[in-house]
């Protein structure tokens, strides 16, 4: 495994000649309840990327620690950048790696709020620069709840010394927006509105309107049970992408008739 930030330029030169694939981890610095560190998303993204890089030999770029998190802005310590700035920055980082020989960029994303912008970045790389790019969330489907039991368990697995379980809370989400009744996060029946976390929870533990999110039952063992099989699955996928001819992963021209 190679963390790009830990090698010299001469080592990097050799590295890019030997491997045309890179992992670009990204997350956020935002509140994750009173018990989890603000860096939860980017810390998990970095740790997961390292685990996959260790197994596949794919270079891991430095983690991008700040993303699209303005909806958590009322909680002290949360940092964010506007979506257009984030898109431009992520594209620029990816293209910098490509200037040294990367042809496949795998964006390992730890924060759901980044996803729409990252899909646009991946599309631009594939469409405009002949670079295959894909976006992966750094946790498997079914890990629901912001700062809930599963995410907290993942934190305990990767960096338990940063988690303060004595502060963990179980939080039932608010369902009221003034006189109106919410039917989901940011939903009023068939209508959606731009919500902030504070609309739903005073603690930052978040799930869905009217839903109780539990964080007090989190354990390191649960985190290992979540991330162990998922790591194996992603390792197999990354190895297949690494072995593929990048030109075969690009869009094909339309052949009329």
What are these regions (language model features)?
Residues 1-104, 112-257:
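Extended, histidine- and acidic-residue-enriched regions that form the cofactor-binding/catalytic faces
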